[in-house]
Amino acid sequence: MTIKTLALQCRDAAQVVSQLSAPAKHALLDAMAAALEADAAAILAANARDLEAARAKGTGSAMLDRLALDDKRLAGIAAALREVAQLPDPVGRITREDVRPNGIRVQKVRVPLGVIAMIYEARPNVTADAAALCIKAGNGVILRGGSEAIHSNTAIARALQRALREANVPDAALTLVEDLRRETMLELLQLNDIVDLAIPRGGEGLIRFVAEHARVPVIKHYKGVCHLFVDASAEMELALRLLIDGKATRPSACNSLETLLVHAGIAERFLPLAAQALRERKVELRGDAATQAVLPDIAAASDDDYAAEFLDLILAIRVVPDLDTALAHIRQYGSDHTEVIATQDADNAERFVQSLRSAVVMVNASSRFSDGGELGLGAEIGISTTRLHSYGPMGLEALTVERFVVRGEGQVRH
């Protein structure tokens, strides 16, 4: 079956999903979560095959962490589906209502986007998260995962599709692309008369490929080169907490810290404490000359290091003379994802927030909160670094659009 045929079937199924009531979608998502739990053994066995193949190819630790499933992670995925089920349904929500002087009643109403193509790499959880969010928002979804997770994705998709069929919803509403050839993905990205939106999640190469070749509208989940700036007024203990949580808890996450910027006025006191805490957690440090003057045993940081999304236990460090230099560094090397300042200076905090255009800006809070669930959206489909209708963590509302509904009693314009 061609990718165009699959997309057409998904579009037809999306029409069915768009008509489901909020209670029906709630019940459907609960059933999808139960299906994952029922198929847990098969899903974990499939994941073990993917992990074995990935290790044989010498896949790095960050990618292996993203790929891996266990009982706890699978239970978390099922729980996330149930959380999405309980979220308020955005479809049909009236966001504006007005009666014009001529008597017509004008409403802006949220409606589903239609068909969403999700293109991602070694993250089996995205298969379930994307399906849940798209269906809750009344859409069909085409899932094109990476070859690294093909067995895991297939097992998850089969379980979710069974729940759809049992609810009398066409299982094409959740279409998994099993033909992973690049030319098939290219064809999918050309189907702008069928597919309404493409969302790539993965490495920089994948996202650039999708953005450069798509005729379908694209919202990019670009790399997360996230910074922590420790201002001269920062409380040491608070800044250390933000640093450790942001770098060492899950370095493979896109909201983990990659670069530490430290005000020169606090560097001699803060950097030794930071280095000790990070080394205890096996973090490799790389710094500029000013950092090496305080920490002489660390490697030099290159220009490429400051632009890198390591997704690993590696941190680039730079000492800066002031806030303006920190802001200039972030503008040059950042990816518009998430930036953090540790400060007790309210004016500097406000300048930091107002001067950066990143999707998420934090003041005295960990970069790891840059997540749909933590920010109150429920599960997220990605973190948009594209300034379109959605910017930052994308929850349910980002998978809908507003349209006008006008009601009258025969009014004409002329």
UniProtKB/Swiss-Prot annotation:
Gene3D superfamilies, alphabetized: Aldehyde Dehydrogenase, Chain A, domain 1, Aldehyde Dehydrogenase, Chain A, domain 2
GO MF annotations in UniProt: glutamate-5-semialdehyde dehydrogenase activity; NADP binding
Domain of life: Bacteria
UniProt subcellular location: Cytoplasm
Catalytic reactions on record: L-glutamate 5-semialdehyde + phosphate + NADP(+) = L-glutamyl 5-phosphate + NADPH + H(+)
PROSITE patterns named in the record: PROA
Enzyme nomenclature, EC number: 1.2.1.41
Keywords on record: Amino-acid biosynthesis, Cytoplasm, NADP, Oxidoreductase, Proline biosynthesis
One Pfam family recorded for the sequence: Aldedh
One of the GO BP terms on file: L-proline biosynthetic process
Alphabetized NCBIfam families for the sequence: PRK00197.1, proA
Record-linked HAMAP family: ProA
Described purpose of this protein according to its UniProt entry: Catalyzes the NADPH-dependent reduction of L-glutamate 5-phosphate into L-glutamate 5-semialdehyde and phosphate. The product spontaneously undergoes cyclization to form 1-pyrroline-5-carboxylate.
Entry protein name: Gamma-glutamyl phosphate reductase
